[in-house]
């Protein structure tokens, strides 16, 4: 596979995951960068500048939404009949290789929540593959390639990217009228999130914020199992919330019993 814009924040982790899975990867980017140097250190050839000859013998091409059809490498791929996929489609294909795919969505809080889930799942020894839209100190990066059967992805609604995913657990933190350069209005955003929830297969689950009215309205009538969470209401909620030096701690209540005590640090 050849990745156009391979040095990007969302493309370099993709290259690492595909490389780790044994796929032959090449790429190109407009400039040198630490990400490009890192990929080269892994044995992935990266060309600087976009030229048709960079495709080599690639059997498929992956690009970000920012790379348009006028790009010489994309144009050459179309001319040669080489299939071209968006980055989100590639992540979706990767997810199918995992038994558990935890996809965390929402207008706000995605990076923080994905990071916290990564801490928890790694502490449980599950060795997940992770893609986060920011740098997590625990990882020293925004991604990791694991060998377990779990993948955790920050899942963005912009351009309906998350509709290319295959979540077994779809988390919706909140929904607001955002990215209105793409969506028409709040209702259009809500339709996208409903379609995201509907991607969950039999045996999967939707996790939703009980405190967010738009999220609950969006999921009204949802046929997939929905588990809600909230500060005071929800299937899972907090009790005994207190603050110590600006940091919260609380009991997690599940099925009317204390499931765990949480202290954020």
Model-derived features: positions:
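Short linear Ser/Thr-Pro motifs
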Residues: 10-12, 33, 64, 156, ...
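Short amphipathic alpha-helix with an adjacent loop that forms part of the alpha/beta core around
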Residues: 50-57
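Beta-strand->loop->alpha-helix junctions that form or flank phosphate-binding loops
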Residues: 28-30, 47-50, 85-92, 130-134, ...
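Short polybasic amphipathic segments
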Residues: 248-254
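Short coil/loop residues immediately preceding or within conserved phosphate-binding loops
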Residues: 99-101, 247, 259
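Phosphate-binding loop of NTP-binding sites
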Residues: 17-20, 40, 54, 65-210, ...
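Short acidic/polar mixed-charge low-complexity motifs
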Residues: 149, 232-234, 256-260
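ATP-dependent carboxylate-amine ligase
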Residues: 1-45, 57, 61, 79-82, ...
């Amino acid at each position: 596979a050849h990745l156009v814009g391979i040095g990007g924040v969302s493309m370099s982790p993709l290259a690492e995951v595909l490389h780790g899975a044994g796929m032959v990867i090449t790429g190109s980017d407009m400039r040198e960068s630490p990400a490009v140097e890192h990929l080269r250190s892994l044995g992935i050839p990266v060309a600087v500048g976009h030229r048709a000859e960079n495709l080599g013998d690639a059997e498929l091409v992956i690009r970000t939404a920012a790379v348009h059809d006028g790009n010489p490498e994309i144009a050459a791929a179309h001319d040669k009949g080489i299939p071209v996929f968006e980055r989100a489609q590639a992540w979706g294909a990767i997810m199918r290789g995992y038994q558990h795919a935890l996809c965390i969505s929402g207008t706000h809080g995605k990076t923080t929540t994905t990071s916290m889930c990564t801490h928890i799942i790694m502490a449980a020894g599950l060795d997940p593959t992770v893609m986060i839209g920011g740098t997590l100190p625990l990882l020293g990066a925004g991604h990791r390639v694991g060998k377990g059967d779990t993948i955790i992805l920050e899942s963005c609604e912009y351009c309906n990217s998350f509709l290319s995913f295959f979540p077994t657990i779809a988390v919706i933190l909140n929904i607001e009228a955002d990215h209105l350069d793409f969506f028409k209005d709040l209702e259009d955003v809500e339709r996208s999130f409903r379609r995201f929830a509907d991607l969950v297969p039999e045996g999967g689950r939707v996790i939703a914020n009980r405190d967010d009215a738009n999220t609950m309205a969006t999921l009204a009538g949802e046929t997939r199992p929905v588990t809600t969470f909230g500060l005071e209401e929800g299937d899972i909620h907090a009790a005994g919330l207190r603050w110590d030096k600006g940091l919260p701690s609380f009991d997690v209540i599940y099925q009317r019993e204390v499931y765990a005590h949480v202290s954020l640090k």
